[in-house]
């Protein structure tokens, strides 16, 4: 009743019925609790009787174990006396056998020493063999990597040479476009001053110049295709006689500026690749003239490997890792930076 809210009653009969129902509910709960208590008491008495029976059995088993323990102690004493007697007899026999054993041990030590020397020599030979095999595999792997890297660099150099041609052609085309734009602007100014009533013809001339700049390719063409660019004079106006808007003219000029920026980026990248190729060539000549050492075994025996170390660096042969290649020039093909022309031609 502490947590329940007492409702409001409209009549005395409703209040009486409510309290009567509540009392019946509490009476039923009390009856259930009393039944559970009686059941719990009966279970407790049964458990207590069972535990008492187990206690009696445990005490009986403990007494039996104590009796067995006492009997085993007597047997141990008898066995100790018998063991001492046997030990005295065996000691005499052991003293006689030890003399024979000392002689056989001396012979055995000599044989063991000889066997250890043979095993050590065998281990040294096997270790030298494994080191030789591992070194040979490492040398072959590095040789293959060097060959692949050199082939890749040679292909890159070929691409750079073709890019030089394309870059020079782009420069020439851009220079021609700038000159032609300047000439046409001057012609347009002269025409505007001489004939101010004909703006449509001037617009058409400017549109043809802008269309010529729009027709230039943004990247060099690939190998096997003719690396030629159409002359601005030979490019037709794709819009017919309709003039271009000022935004189209600005876009065309922006394209020309982008071409010039890309050409400059290609020149800087080509210079870096040339410097790296020169470094690789000098490094290869230094390695081929200095690396010719072999692998030493455990006894100091030298195995000459001059025929396998001529293509590897001196640090790898002496047990040190070679210097890593410069960033961006690993086994995978480097990607072009954003806003630059691709290297493939």
Swiss-Prot record:
According to UniProt, the name of this protein is: Nuclear distribution protein nudE-like 1
Phosphoserine is found on 215, 231, 242, 344
Upon changing residue 266 to A, the result is: Abolishes interaction with DISC1
Q: Which UniProt keywords apply?
A: Centromere, Chromosome, Coiled coil, Cytoplasm, Cytoskeleton, Developmental protein, Differentiation, Kinetochore, Lipoprotein, Microtubule, Neurogenesis, Palmitate, Phosphoprotein, Transport
Molecular functions per Gene Ontology: alpha-tubulin binding; beta-tubulin binding; identical protein binding; microtubule binding
Known role: Required for organization of the cellular microtubule array and microtubule anchoring at the centrosome. May regulate microtubule organization at least in part by targeting the microtubule severing protein KATNA1 to the centrosome. Also positively regulates the activity of the minus-end directed microtubule motor protein dynein. May enhance dynein-mediated microtubule sliding by targeting dynein to the microtubule plus ends.
Q: Quick one: where's region Interaction with NEFL?
A: 191-345
Q: For the region Interaction with YWHAE, what residue ranges are annotated?
A: 189-256
Expression across tissues is: Expressed in brain, heart, kidney, liver, lung, pancreas, placenta and skeletal muscle.
Residues covered by region (Required for localization to the centrosome and interaction with dynein, dynactin, tubulin gamma, PCM1 and PCNT): 256-291
Per the record, the coiled-coil ranges are 28-190
């Amino acid at each position: 009743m502490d947590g329940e809210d007492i409702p409001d009653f409209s009549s005395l009969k409703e209040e009486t019925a409510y309290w009567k129902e509540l009392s019946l509910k509490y009476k039923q709960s009390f009856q259930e609790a009393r039944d559970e208590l009686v059941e719990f008491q009966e279970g407790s008495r049964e458990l207590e009787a069972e535990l008492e029976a187990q206690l009696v059995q445990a005490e009986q088993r403990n007494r039996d174990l104590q009796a067995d323990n006492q009997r085993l102690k007597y047997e141990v004493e008898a066995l100790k006396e018998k063991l001492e007697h046997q030990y005295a007899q065996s000691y005499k026999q052991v003293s006689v056998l030890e003399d024979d054993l000392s002689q056989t041990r001396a012979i055995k030590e000599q044989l063991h020493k000889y066997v250890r020397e043979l095993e050590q020599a065998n281990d040294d030979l096997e270790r030298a063999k494994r080191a030789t095999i591992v070194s040979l595999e490492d040398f072959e792997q590095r040789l293959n990597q060097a060959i692949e890297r050199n082939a890749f660099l040679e292909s890159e150099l070929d691409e750079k040479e073709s890019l030089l041609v394309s870059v020079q052609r782009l420069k020439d085309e851009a220079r021609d476009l700038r000159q032609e734009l300047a000439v046409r602007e001057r012609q347009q100014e002269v025409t505007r001053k001489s004939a101010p009533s004909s703006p449509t013809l001037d617009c058409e001339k400017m549109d043809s110049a802008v269309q010529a700049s729009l027709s230039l390719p943004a990247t060099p063409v690939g190998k096997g295709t003719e690396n030629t660019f159409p002359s601005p004079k030979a490019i037709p106006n794709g819009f017919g006689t309709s003039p271009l808007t000022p935004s189209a003219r600005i876009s065309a000029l922006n394209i020309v500026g982008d071409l010039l920026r890309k050409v400059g980026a290609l020149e800087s990248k080509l210079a870096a690749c040339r410097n790296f190729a020169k470094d690789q060539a000098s490094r290869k000549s230094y390695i081929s003239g200095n690396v010719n050492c072999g692998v030493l075994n455990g006894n100091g025996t030298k195995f000459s490997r001059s025929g396998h170390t001529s293509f590897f660096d001196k640090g790898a042969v002496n047990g040190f890792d070679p210097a890593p290649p410069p960033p961006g020039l690993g086994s995978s093909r480097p990607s072009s930076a954003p806003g630059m022309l691709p290297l493939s031609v």
